[in-house]
Amino acid sequence: MEGAGGANDKKKISSERRKEKSRDAARSRRSKESEVFYELAHQLPLPHNVSSHLDKASVMRLTISYLRVRKLLDAGDLDIEDEMKAQMNCFYLKALDGFVMVLTDDGDMIYISDNVNKYMGLTQFELTGHSVFDFTHPCDHEEMREMLTHRNGLVKKGKEQNTQRSFFLRMKCTLTSRGRTMNIKSATWKVLHCTGHIHVYDTNSNQSQCGYKKPPMTCLVLICEPIPHPSNIEIPLDSKTFLSRHSLDMKFSYCDERITELMGYEPEELLGRSIYEYYHALDSDHLTKTHHDMFTKGQVTTGQYRMLAKRGGYVWIETQATVIYNTKNSQPQCIVCVNYVVSGIIQHDLIFSLQQTECVLKPVESSDMKMTQLFTKVESEDTSSLFDKLKKEPDALTLLAPAAGDTIISLDFGSNDTETDDQQLEEVPLYNDVMLPSSNEKLQNINLAMSPLPASETPKPLRSSADPALNQEVALKLEPNPESLELSFTMPQIQDQPASPSDGSTRQSSPEPNSPSEYCFDVDSDMVNEFKLELVEKLFAEDTEAKNPFSTQDTDLDLEMLAPYIPMDDDFQLRSFDQLSPLENSSTSPQSASTNTVFQPTQMQKPPIATVTTTATSDELKTVTKDGMEDIKILIAFPSPPHVPKEPPCATTSPYSDTGSRTASPNRAGKGVIEQTEKSHPRSPNVLSVALSQRTTAPEEELNPKILALQNAQRKRKIEHDGSLFQAVGIGTLLQQPDDRATTTSLSWKRVKGCKSSEQNGMEQKTIILIPSDLACRLLGQSMDESGLPQLTSYDCEVNAPIQGSRNLLQGEELLRALDQVN
């Protein structure tokens, strides 16, 4: 029993020795291992205080990472660093807005810069050697693997494989908003903008001892830039940066006012507009993908892109966009952008979108327009305030009136004596055929006859309160000077040319007037002057050869545009009347009636009548009656159209401005009215006479040279407001009675004014009485076949005039007898 107990004790002692030896061997082994790790840790390029506290796993992790980095560095062609480069190395990381990270193709972080602690809260030694997938968001792992993959397959000819990488990565961050460090288990996700490239290292030592070649080493070199939250921006924004807030559809809801200085936009005009309207077209695809990442990961930075300026061109901008979430339901609420403008406006004269054309199309108010508005204000301003406004612009001070005591220098617009008459005539303001008197003596001597008004008669102003259409500016231009009671007009001196050799005898009917004053007739209350026929014919005739320089202006100036304005309410309306007694006895009178009987005064008891008195020598009247009234003609006669509205809106207008005027203005006949109508045979002594004629065709009859002159006349333009030639020259519209198949016509008369002319010896005084338009229409309105007379418009008067001459017209006593019967 004792032997068995001693053996057991020996076994226990041997086992304890073995355990002790094992513990000593393990202790020795650990100590040797620790010595090895200690020596290895001290071999790492780490500070002593860091390397002395590293565990074995960290030493192994860091050593492996270090060996890989050394392998990468040995594969490259590295230059020997000089002292200057060594000193600059410490500034590189400070210049970066992020940290540097090198990943293997497996995702291991073989190198990370020591400033990662500043941005992520994690130290360099905590991350080096670890897999990047241990610190990144699980939703980003797939994208991360795609970025690490380098395809070694065949590449199309002419193209290189893209090795550039740019993506957004969410990584764990242990930093709080206050800058404190938290536990890794409580870390939040921070978005990093990672940009870099894949680098392939092909070393010479890839050939192993076994004979196979190792693949080249591939790594991804990245610069990771964290995107700051707008609420955590500590650095003040400079003048080249502006803030903006957008809705989830990227429409502006707020914009900083600094955008006005940078791009020209006003913050108010951007509200409600989509940011996509202001992107350059070439950057829209890139920005669309960036906004996709923003809604997925919460934050993005766009990189540099082009944004259109307001007035053309674009600027380069880099934007940091952040999605703001609602604190209650964690739903996205809006987007806040920090925009950094990195350039000025480029190609400012180039238009890229319709928004940039709005400012081009909008009129810009110039300084001249402001000055005009300043003087056209209705309310009167104080002179001192006006001076204060104008003194800011020195050129505008010339518009102020001189102060009291200043010397006023009168402006002399007279011409020098060395100027020719033709140069002076170009400066003469012509108002149709009526011209205000000129102060220049030379102009008065160039065939300009002045017809003074009597001292007892003062010309009435052209302004009329009853006529609102009368322009004040026109009235001021046409109103005669109160200091000068003289009016003058110019008329080309013409010579009648015979239409054929057989018409040569008609040129001796009357001497040619020497001055325009012979065209004027004085209207006396006694109606004792007689009417000069030939002068009236020449008044409305125009010759091709002029005797003074004024005739050269007939084709250059639109004189009718400068004629005195006549309100329409001064004339009589065309109206339709009931049927009166027929004029059957008035159509069969002979043509050889005496001219004197035509001008006999007719006793009328109707109120106001217009009288025209003229003077003519007895020799002239004898010449007129020589050929049996051949020279007495109807200048204008109108057939009535079959269908005319009863009440046309147009009204004839008088060519004279006022009843106080005493100067007749001769107007030239226009081709727009005469070219189809003035081929008739002369039958009437005056264009102011009333006649009833029958329409016949006589191509074999000879044409009077006086009517030829009227036929060939050309007028510049038609009178506005449906006015015809007869309204312009003051010719009373005439009534023509055609054959049985023609309809009768009723037209209104014009009031005619005359001016005083010098009396001649041996004159006989005759008087012609012109009946007002209403009375004449009532007297002549009845027809034999019609129940009423249709109204005539100016178009009917101009188009439906007779082409050939008229025969068998009522003359002299027959005409007056017909008028008496109607009365």
Swiss-Prot record:
Keywords noted in UniProt: Acetylation, Activator, Cytoplasm, DNA-binding, Hydroxylation, Isopeptide bond, Nucleus, Phosphoprotein, Repeat, S-nitrosylation, Transcription, Transcription regulation, Ubl conjugation
Query: What Gene3D superfamilies does the database record attribute to this sequence?
Result: Helix-loop-helix DNA-binding domain, PAS domain
Per UniProt, what is one GO molecular function of this protein?
A: transcription coactivator binding
Instruction: Please verify whether the record's keywords include Repeat.
Output: yes
Concerning PTM, the database record says: S-nitrosylation of Cys-797 may be responsible for increased recruitment of p300 coactivator necessary for transcriptional activity of HIF-1 complex. Acetylation of Lys-532 by ARD1 increases interaction with VHL and stimulates subsequent proteasomal degradation. Deacetylation of Lys-706 by SIRT2 increases its interaction with and hydroxylation by EGLN1 thereby inactivating HIF1A activity by inducing its proteasomal degradation.
Give the PROSITE patterns listed for this entry. BHLH, PAS
What are the subcellular locations of this protein? Answer: Cytoplasm; Nucleus
The annotated region (ODD) lies at 401-600
Q: Which residues carry this modification: Phosphoserine?
A: 247, 551, 576, 589, 654
Q: Cross-link Glycyl lysine isopeptide (Lys-Gly) (interchain with G-Cter in ubiquitin) maps to which residues of the chain?
A: 532, 538, 547
The record places the motif (Nuclear localization signal) at 715-721
Pfam families linked? bHLH_HIF1A, HIF-1, HIF-1a_CTAD, PAS, PAS_3
Q: bHLH domain location, by residue?
A: 17-70
Listed as disulfide-bonded, the cysteine pairs are none
Description of how activity is regulated: Induced by reactive oxygen species (ROS).
The UniProt entry, under SUPFAM superfamilies, shows:
HLH, helix-loop-helix DNA-binding domain (SSF47459), PYP-like sensor domain (PAS domain) (SSF55785)
Q: Where is this region: DNA-binding?
A: 21-30
Function field: Functions as a master transcriptional regulator of the adaptive response to hypoxia. Under hypoxic conditions, activates the transcription of over 40 genes, including erythropoietin, glucose transporters, glycolytic enzymes, vascular endothelial growth factor, HILPDA, and other genes whose protein products increase oxygen delivery or facilitate metabolic adaptation to hypoxia. Plays an essential role in embryonic vascularization, tumor angiogenesis and pathophysiology of ischemic disease.
What protein name does the entry list? Hypoxia-inducible factor 1-alpha
- The scientific name of the source species is Bos taurus (Bovine)
